[in-house]
Design a protein with these regions (language model features):
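Core of folded catalytic or high-affinity ligand/protein-binding domains
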Residues: 43-223
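Sequence termini and other peripheral, non-core segments
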Residues: 1-82, 88, 225-248
Length: 248
């Protein structure tokens, strides 16, 4: 598949304008409780996002169109899920690149872009439609594990909490803020390590970084990881890194 090819999927046509989702705080709170009791229950993340995100996806798409290469990215409409499931493509990335780090991460953690997408389809059926906003929502979903690499946050409980705070700063999606706040409140009484400060730093790092949703990820994955972080103004996760892995 070339850089400009798009993924062919049986997405339902969007024959009517997508409605702005109504925020459902009760649904979000129940899902947050389930997520905090089991961080591996990824489906609850999509429940929360669907309940709280409102029109943030539409706003993100419109913002993309105002960026230097956003018009091209929107026109090409590459489906990152399929690109990230191409094992031969992932194997082509040289050591030290963002792509190599992503490849090693998902394989060592037994993750896949398709696995994450399948969970989202179970919880958010409208993400399947053939509509620019839905495509942008899929794109945002599919870069989550790449953001793990760029941010330096691992998949432990604290790392996920820091990354959702980082993601809120990047996307403005209220669901991310809700999850980050829940995680921070849960760790507030644990004074041995700076958990809340690390989560807050995640937000500040996301705010200081360039807008990652405007990136051409097929190109970004070829960049050396350290150089990409410098270009994108992603500072070190100093507080997170200061906490022993066993305590995260």
């Amino acid at each position: 598949m070339t850089m400009t090819e798009t993924m062919t999927l049986p997405y339902a046509p969007a024959d009517a304008p997508l409605e702005r989702p109504r925020r459902q705080w009760g649904v979000a709170l129940q899902a947050l409780r389930r997520l905090l009791s089991d961080k591996e229950d990824t489906g609850q993340v999509f429940e929360i996002m669907g309940a709280l995100n409102g029109d943030s996806t539409a706003k993100g798409y419109r913002r993309l169109l105002q960026t230097l290469q956003g018009g091209r990215l929107a026109y090409e409409r590459v489906e990152l899920e399929q690109r990230l499931m191409d094992g031969a493509w992932l194997d082509s990335f040289a050591a030290g690149t963002v792509g190599a780090a992503y490849r090693d991460f998902v394989r060592s953690e037994n993750l896949s872009a398709q696995g994450l997408a399948d969970i989202s389809r179970e919880k958010r059926s409208k993400i399947e439609v053939s509509h620019p906003y839905a495509w942008f929502g899929r794109r945002t979903r599919d870069v989550h594990d790449i953001w793990h690499i760029l941010s330096g946050y691992h998949r432990d409980g604290l790392g996920e909490a820091c990354l959702v705070a980082f993601s809120y700063a990047q996307t403005g999606s209220l669901g991310w803020a809700f999850i980050a706040l829940g995680a921070a409140l849960r760790t507030r009484g644990e004074a041995k390590h700076p958990y809340v400060q690390a989560i807050w730093q995640g937000y500040r790092r996301g705010k200081a970084a360039k807008w990652l949703l405007a990136e051409d990820y097929e190109r970004l994955l070829t960049e050396p990881l350290d150089a990409a972080r410098r270009r994108l103004n992603i500072a070190p996760a100093s507080l997170y890194d200061s906490i022993p892995a066993s305590a995260r």
